[in-house]
Amino acid sequence: MKIWTSEHVFDHPWETVTTAAMQKYPNPMNPSVVGVDVLDRHVDPSGKLHSHRLLSTEWGLPSIVKSLIGAARTKTYVQEHSVVDPIRRTMELKSTNISFTNMVSVDERLTYKPHPQDPEKTVLTQEALITVKGVSLSSYLEGLMASTISSNANKGREAMEWVIHKLNAEIEELAASARGSIRTPMAAAAALVDK
Protein backbone atom coordinates (compact mmCIF):
# COMPACT_ATOMS: atom_id res chain seq x y z
CA MET A 1 0.00 0.00 0.00
CA LYS A 2 1.25 3.49 -0.90
CA ILE A 3 -0.10 6.75 0.50
CA TRP A 4 0.30 9.97 -1.48
CA THR A 5 -0.60 13.41 -0.09
CA SER A 6 -0.48 16.98 -1.35
CA GLU A 7 -1.66 20.45 -0.41
CA HIS A 8 -2.20 23.39 -2.74
CA VAL A 9 -3.47 26.95 -2.26
CA PHE A 10 -5.66 28.50 -4.96
CA ASP A 11 -5.65 32.30 -5.19
CA HIS A 12 -9.44 32.29 -5.50
CA PRO A 13 -12.27 32.27 -2.93
CA TRP A 14 -13.82 28.97 -1.86
CA GLU A 15 -17.08 29.60 -3.75
CA THR A 16 -15.20 30.06 -7.02
CA VAL A 17 -12.99 27.00 -6.53
CA THR A 18 -15.85 24.67 -5.58
CA THR A 19 -17.91 25.88 -8.55
CA ALA A 20 -14.94 25.08 -10.80
CA ALA A 21 -14.43 21.67 -9.14
CA MET A 22 -17.98 20.67 -10.09
CA GLN A 23 -17.30 21.71 -13.72
CA LYS A 24 -13.72 20.46 -14.02
CA TYR A 25 -14.36 17.86 -16.74
CA PRO A 26 -13.91 17.79 -19.64
CA ASN A 27 -10.77 19.91 -19.88
CA PRO A 28 -7.78 20.02 -22.23
CA MET A 29 -5.26 19.33 -19.44
CA ASN A 30 -6.60 15.83 -18.75
CA PRO A 31 -8.10 14.38 -21.94
CA SER A 32 -8.13 10.89 -20.42
CA VAL A 33 -11.47 11.75 -18.72
CA VAL A 34 -13.83 11.05 -21.61
CA GLY A 35 -17.17 11.19 -19.81
CA VAL A 36 -18.90 12.36 -16.64
CA ASP A 37 -22.37 11.15 -15.71
CA VAL A 38 -24.30 12.46 -12.71
CA LEU A 39 -25.94 9.44 -11.10
CA ASP A 40 -27.53 11.31 -8.20
CA ARG A 41 -27.55 14.86 -6.90
CA HIS A 42 -29.60 16.17 -4.02
CA VAL A 43 -29.62 18.67 -1.18
CA ASP A 44 -30.12 17.13 2.25
CA PRO A 45 -32.25 18.76 5.02
CA SER A 46 -29.16 20.51 6.45
CA GLY A 47 -28.47 22.23 3.10
CA LYS A 48 -25.50 20.09 1.98
CA LEU A 49 -25.25 19.26 -1.71
CA HIS A 50 -24.50 15.56 -2.31
CA SER A 51 -23.36 14.39 -5.75
CA HIS A 52 -22.59 10.90 -7.03
CA ARG A 53 -20.91 10.86 -10.42
CA LEU A 54 -19.41 8.23 -12.70
CA LEU A 55 -16.22 9.25 -14.51
CA SER A 56 -15.19 7.34 -17.63
CA THR A 57 -11.47 7.44 -18.34
CA GLU A 58 -9.29 6.06 -21.09
CA TRP A 59 -5.62 5.48 -20.37
CA GLY A 60 -2.54 4.43 -22.25
CA LEU A 61 -0.90 1.87 -20.02
CA PRO A 62 2.77 1.34 -19.08
CA SER A 63 4.35 -1.69 -20.79
CA ILE A 64 4.54 -3.69 -17.55
CA VAL A 65 0.80 -3.24 -17.00
CA LYS A 66 0.05 -4.05 -20.66
CA SER A 67 1.78 -7.38 -20.23
CA LEU A 68 -0.25 -8.13 -17.09
CA ILE A 69 -3.68 -7.35 -18.51
CA GLY A 70 -3.03 -7.79 -22.23
CA ALA A 71 -4.24 -4.37 -23.43
CA ALA A 72 -2.51 -1.20 -24.62
CA ARG A 73 -5.37 1.18 -23.79
CA THR A 74 -8.23 0.61 -21.50
CA LYS A 75 -11.40 2.33 -20.43
CA THR A 76 -11.80 2.50 -16.68
CA TYR A 77 -14.53 3.83 -14.44
CA VAL A 78 -14.30 5.82 -11.24
CA GLN A 79 -17.13 6.58 -8.85
CA GLU A 80 -17.03 9.96 -7.18
CA HIS A 81 -19.02 11.16 -4.17
CA SER A 82 -18.88 14.78 -3.11
CA VAL A 83 -20.48 16.78 -0.32
CA VAL A 84 -20.56 20.58 -0.44
CA ASP A 85 -21.40 22.24 2.86
CA PRO A 86 -22.10 25.92 2.14
CA ILE A 87 -22.51 26.77 5.83
CA ARG A 88 -19.16 25.32 7.00
CA ARG A 89 -17.69 26.20 3.57
CA THR A 90 -16.17 22.80 2.91
CA MET A 91 -16.23 20.47 -0.05
CA GLU A 92 -15.12 16.89 0.35
CA LEU A 93 -14.77 14.65 -2.66
CA LYS A 94 -14.03 10.93 -2.46
CA SER A 95 -13.35 8.77 -5.48
CA THR A 96 -12.47 5.15 -6.06
CA ASN A 97 -11.93 3.03 -9.12
CA ILE A 98 -14.61 0.47 -9.95
CA SER A 99 -12.65 -1.13 -12.81
CA PHE A 100 -9.81 -3.61 -12.28
CA THR A 101 -10.52 -3.73 -8.54
CA ASN A 102 -9.15 -7.27 -8.43
CA MET A 103 -5.74 -5.82 -9.43
CA VAL A 104 -5.60 -2.30 -8.06
CA SER A 105 -7.53 0.07 -5.87
CA VAL A 106 -7.06 3.81 -5.76
CA ASP A 107 -9.04 5.67 -3.11
CA GLU A 108 -8.67 9.41 -3.30
CA ARG A 109 -9.96 12.18 -1.05
CA LEU A 110 -9.90 15.90 -1.81
CA THR A 111 -10.95 18.59 0.63
CA TYR A 112 -11.49 22.24 -0.26
CA LYS A 113 -11.63 24.81 2.56
CA PRO A 114 -11.11 28.56 2.79
CA HIS A 115 -7.54 29.49 3.68
CA PRO A 116 -7.44 30.11 7.46
CA GLN A 117 -5.55 33.43 7.10
CA ASP A 118 -6.96 34.69 3.79
CA PRO A 119 -10.63 34.15 2.87
CA GLU A 120 -9.84 35.10 -0.75
CA LYS A 121 -7.81 31.88 -1.08
CA THR A 122 -8.74 28.19 -0.92
CA VAL A 123 -6.73 25.26 0.43
CA LEU A 124 -6.96 21.94 -1.41
CA THR A 125 -5.78 18.89 0.51
CA GLN A 126 -5.42 15.67 -1.49
CA GLU A 127 -4.60 12.15 -0.43
CA ALA A 128 -4.62 8.87 -2.29
CA LEU A 129 -4.32 5.34 -1.01
CA ILE A 130 -2.95 3.02 -3.71
CA THR A 131 -2.98 -0.76 -3.41
CA VAL A 132 -1.76 -3.14 -6.12
CA LYS A 133 -2.90 -6.71 -5.52
CA GLY A 134 -1.53 -10.13 -6.42
CA VAL A 135 1.69 -9.03 -8.13
CA SER A 136 5.22 -9.56 -6.86
CA LEU A 137 6.21 -6.05 -8.00
CA SER A 138 3.30 -4.40 -6.18
CA SER A 139 5.45 -1.92 -4.25
CA TYR A 140 7.17 -0.80 -7.47
CA LEU A 141 3.84 -0.46 -9.29
CA GLU A 142 2.31 1.47 -6.37
CA GLY A 143 5.25 3.90 -6.59
CA LEU A 144 4.67 4.33 -10.35
CA MET A 145 0.99 4.96 -9.74
CA ALA A 146 1.78 7.50 -7.00
CA SER A 147 3.99 9.37 -9.50
CA THR A 148 1.16 9.31 -12.04
CA ILE A 149 -1.30 10.59 -9.44
CA SER A 150 1.11 13.40 -8.53
CA SER A 151 1.45 14.38 -12.20
CA ASN A 152 -2.32 14.21 -12.68
CA ALA A 153 -2.84 16.34 -9.56
CA ASN A 154 -0.70 19.06 -11.15
CA LYS A 155 -2.76 18.78 -14.34
CA GLY A 156 -5.91 18.90 -12.19
CA ARG A 157 -4.82 22.16 -10.58
CA GLU A 158 -4.07 23.60 -14.04
CA ALA A 159 -7.52 22.43 -15.15
CA MET A 160 -9.12 24.17 -12.17
CA GLU A 161 -7.40 27.44 -13.14
CA TRP A 162 -8.57 26.92 -16.74
CA VAL A 163 -12.19 26.39 -15.59
CA ILE A 164 -12.03 29.41 -13.26
CA HIS A 165 -10.73 31.57 -16.13
CA LYS A 166 -13.51 30.24 -18.37
CA LEU A 167 -16.18 30.93 -15.70
CA ASN A 168 -14.86 34.46 -15.12
CA ALA A 169 -14.93 35.13 -18.89
CA GLU A 170 -18.55 33.90 -19.05
CA ILE A 171 -19.52 36.13 -16.12
CA GLU A 172 -17.86 39.13 -17.75
CA GLU A 173 -19.63 38.39 -21.05
CA LEU A 174 -23.00 38.17 -19.27
CA ALA A 175 -22.31 41.40 -17.40
CA ALA A 176 -21.38 43.19 -20.64
CA SER A 177 -24.50 41.84 -22.30
CA ALA A 178 -26.64 42.96 -19.36
CA ARG A 179 -25.07 46.44 -19.44
CA GLY A 180 -25.85 46.63 -23.16
CA SER A 181 -29.46 45.52 -22.59
CA ILE A 182 -29.93 48.20 -19.96
CA ARG A 183 -28.32 50.95 -22.06
CA THR A 184 -30.50 50.34 -25.13
CA PRO A 185 -33.87 51.05 -23.42
CA MET A 186 -32.34 53.90 -21.43
CA ALA A 187 -30.95 55.47 -24.62
CA ALA A 188 -34.36 55.12 -26.26
CA ALA A 189 -36.03 56.72 -23.23
CA ALA A 190 -33.49 59.56 -23.25
CA ALA A 191 -34.14 60.14 -26.95
CA LEU A 192 -37.89 60.44 -26.25
CA VAL A 193 -37.26 62.94 -23.46
CA ASP A 194 -35.06 65.05 -25.76
CA LYS A 195 -37.87 65.35 -28.37
Swiss-Prot record:
Transmembrane segments: none
GO terms of biological process kind: phospholipid transport
PRELI/MSF1 domain residues: 1-172
UniProt KW DNA damage keyword: no
Keyword terms of this UniProt record: Phosphoprotein
Modified residues (Phosphoserine): 46, 51
Gene Ontology MF, one: phosphatidic acid transfer activity
GO cellular component, one term: mitochondrial intermembrane space
Entry's family note: Belongs to the slowmo family.
Name recorded for this polypeptide: PRELI domain containing protein 3B
Organism: Rattus norvegicus
Keyword set includes Phosphoprotein: yes
Coiled-coil ranges from the UniProt annotation: none
